[in-house]
């Protein structure tokens, strides 16, 4: 089967320099959603028709299995499909999709293709409570489709028809090429409409078959930011419903956003206003507090992530405790039972089994062993203005508050570092490391008194 995706429109109502089909839905371009669905049908040819912002669109979705046809002039949907004909296999049927209609299920498209398998002309239709503005499907007394009539051309009786044309079709490619060549642009816009092909098919004696989606929102398109926001909420609720079916506890299904792939184990609990981006895996018994952002991360079983935590490109072992207000950046690796607390930032660092950094700390480019305690205000000074260096802290080290470790430096096993110490040389195992300082107490000191105005 050939699949053609129309993605050449300007999208004026989006009021954006970004081509309409590249606006994101759940973190991916609209067009990427359509291409992903098309791939599940395993087409022999997959062609995207580009026009407005063609180079930008091609760059965004380029892949070995995707070919591009260019519609240099915006002369309608029929004209757009015509540009794809040289890239299609004439012996296979062609399914036409739209780059701004992202939520059509693959199962819906399979039903349409199956309905038209005997060489018929297939149309995906939908029945709406309010069909205003859409082309109506006109049938004869026997129920056969006779034509599609646009809103402006419909009679009062036809305006009562609730079944509308979605624009998604499947048809034999050879006949499609012939019908496209016969299209006329005798309309106010001077465009060639793909919807006009159905009458040519009927005139040629073709059976016109229809199929409908399970949900009408599958056929909704995006022409404005308001419609984009509407589809975002529909899509997110669909994802949330699937998570609930899988046993995930969501404090409020309307307040979780998945912008990628979220895999959850058993007894996972997610509080409100959490965002998951890229590929995220949550193992069994993970608890996510409110207002967290987690991107491209794996979280081990029994882990608790408290409120307002940001995690990006990190790996967390089992039974770790993160946050609140913690930030794990790319390359952060936490072993089982590690703790990273409030206002702690970890980047490109390994934190060993049972080690804790509970307050106000920066750990960057570091290797921290097991059972290490990192006191509040500790900083690994990893950057000299030109290059970055690593800090190594071996097992069972106690780091006092307000410590600076100037990399490259190694702290041996069992070391105790006194509060307020700057470490710039390697420290041998088992010692107390401190910078000796003099504490002075002066009697007779009088605090300044605020002057009266």
UniProtKB/Swiss-Prot annotation:
The lineage of its organism: Bacteria, Pseudomonadati, Pseudomonadota, Betaproteobacteria, Burkholderiales. It comes from the Bacteria. Acetyl-CoA binds at residues 376, 382-383, 401, 419. In the N-terminal section; belongs to the N-acetylglucosamine-1-phosphate uridyltransferase family. In the C-terminal section; belongs to the transferase hexapeptide repeat family. This is Bifunctional protein GlmU. Residues 226-246 are annotated as: Linker. GO terms for molecular function: glucosamine-1-phosphate N-acetyltransferase activity; magnesium ion binding; UDP-N-acetylglucosamine diphosphorylase activity. Mg(2+) binds at residues 100, 223. GO terms for cellular component: cytoplasm; membrane. InterPro entries: Bifunctional_GlmU (IPR005882), GlmU-like (IPR050065), GlmU_C_LbH (IPR038009), Hexapep (IPR001451), Hexapep_transf_CS (IPR018357), MobA-like_NTP_Trfase (IPR025877), Nucleotide-diphossugar_trans (IPR029044), Trimer_LpxA-like_sf (IPR011004). It is found in: Cytoplasm. It catalyses: alpha-D-glucosamine 1-phosphate + acetyl-CoA = N-acetyl-alpha-D-glucosamine 1-phosphate + CoA + H(+); N-acetyl-alpha-D-glucosamine 1-phosphate + UTP + H(+) = UDP-N-acetyl-alpha-D-glucosamine + diphosphate. PANTHER family: BIFUNCTIONAL PROTEIN GLMU, NUCLEOTIDYL TRANSFERASE. The gene is glmU. It comes from Burkholderia ambifaria (strain MC40-6). Its cofactor is Mg(2+). The active site is at 359 (proton acceptor). Its main location: cytoplasm. Keywords: Acyltransferase, Cell shape, Cell wall biogenesis/degradation, Cytoplasm, Magnesium, Metal-binding, Multifunctional enzyme, Nucleotidyltransferase, Peptidoglycan synthesis, Repeat, Transferase. SUPFAM superfamilies: Nucleotide-diphospho-sugar transferases, Trimeric LpxA-like enzymes. Pathway: Nucleotide-sugar biosynthesis; UDP-N-acetyl-alpha-D-glucosamine biosynthesis; N-acetyl-alpha-D-glucosamine 1-phosphate from alpha-D-glucosamine 6-phosphate (route II): step 2/2; Nucleotide-sugar biosynthesis; UDP-N-acetyl-alpha-D-glucosamine biosynthesis; UDP-N-acetyl-alpha-D-glucosamine from N-acetyl-alpha-D-glucosamine 1-phosphate: step 1/1; Bacterial outer membrane biogenesis; LPS lipid A biosynthesis. UDP-N-acetyl-alpha-D-glucosamine binds at residues 6-9, 20, 71, 76-77, 98-100, 135, 150, 165, 223, 329, 347, 362, 373. Residues 247-453 are annotated as: N-acetyltransferase. Catalyzes the last two sequential reactions in the de novo biosynthetic pathway for UDP-N-acetylglucosamine (UDP-GlcNAc). The C-terminal domain catalyzes the transfer of acetyl group from acetyl coenzyme A to glucosamine-1-phosphate (GlcN-1-P) to produce N-acetylglucosamine-1-phosphate (GlcNAc-1-P), which is converted into UDP-GlcNAc by the transfer of uridine 5-monophosphate (from uridine 5-triphosphate), a reaction catalyzed by the N-terminal domain. Its EC number is 2.7.7.23, 2.3.1.157. Homotrimer.
């Amino acid at each position: 089967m050939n699949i053609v995706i129309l993605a050449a429109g300007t999208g004026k109502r989006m009021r954006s320099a970004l081509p309409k089909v590249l606006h994101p839905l759940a973190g991916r371009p609209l067009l990427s959603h359509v291409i992903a669905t098309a791939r599940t049908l395993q087409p022999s040819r997959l062609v995207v028709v580009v026009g407005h912002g063609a180079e930008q669109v091609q760059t965004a979705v380029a892949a070995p299995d995707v070919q591009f046809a260019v519609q240099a002039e915006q002369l309608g949907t029929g004209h757009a499909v015509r540009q794809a004909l040289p890239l299609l296999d004439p012996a296979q049927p062609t399914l036409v999709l739209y780059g701004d209609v992202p939520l059509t299920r693959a199962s819906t498209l399979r039903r349409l293709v199956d309905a038209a398998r005997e060489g018929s002309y297939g149309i995906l239709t939908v029945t709406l409570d309010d069909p205003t503005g859409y082309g109506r499907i006109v049938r004869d007394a026997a129920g056969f489709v006779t034509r599609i009539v646009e809103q402006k051309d419909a009679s009062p009786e036809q305006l009562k028809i609730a079944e509308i044309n979605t624009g998604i079709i499947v048809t034999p490619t050879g006949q499609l090429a012939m019908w496209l060549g016969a299209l006329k642009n005798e309309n106010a816009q001077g465009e060639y409409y793909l919807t006009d092909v159905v009458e040519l098919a009927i005139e040629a004696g073709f059976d016109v078959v229809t199929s409908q989606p399970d949900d009408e929102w599958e056929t909704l398109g995006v022409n404005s930011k308001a419609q984009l926001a509407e589809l975002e909420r529909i899509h997110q609720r669909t994802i949330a419903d699937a998570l609930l079916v899988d046993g995930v506890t969501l404090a409020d299904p309307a307040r979780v956003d998945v912008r990628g792939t979220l895999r959850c184990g058993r007894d996972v609990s997610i509080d409100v206003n959490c965002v998951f981006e890229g590929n995220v895996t949550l193992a069994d018994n993970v608890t996510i507090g409110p207002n967290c952002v987690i991107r491209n991360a794996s979280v081990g079983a029994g882990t608790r992530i408290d409120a307002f935590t940001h995690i990006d490109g990190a790996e967390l072992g089992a039974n770790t405790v993160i946050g609140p207000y913690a930030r794990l950046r790319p390359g952060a690796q936490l072993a089982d039972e590690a703790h990273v607390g409030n206002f702690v930032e970890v980047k490109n660092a390994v934190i060993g089994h049972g080690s804790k950094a509970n307050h106000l700390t920066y750990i960057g480019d570091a290797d921290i062993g097991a059972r290490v305690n990192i006191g509040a205000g500790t900083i690994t000074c990893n950057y000299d203005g030109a290059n970055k260096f690593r800090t190594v802290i071996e097992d069972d080290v106690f780091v006092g508050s307000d410590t600076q470790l100037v990399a490259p430096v190694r702290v041996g096993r069992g070391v105790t570092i006194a509060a307020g110490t700057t470490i710039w040389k390697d420290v041998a195992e088992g010692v107390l490391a401190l910078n000796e300082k003099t504490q002075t107490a002066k009697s007779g000191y009088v605090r300044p008194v605020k002057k009266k105005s």
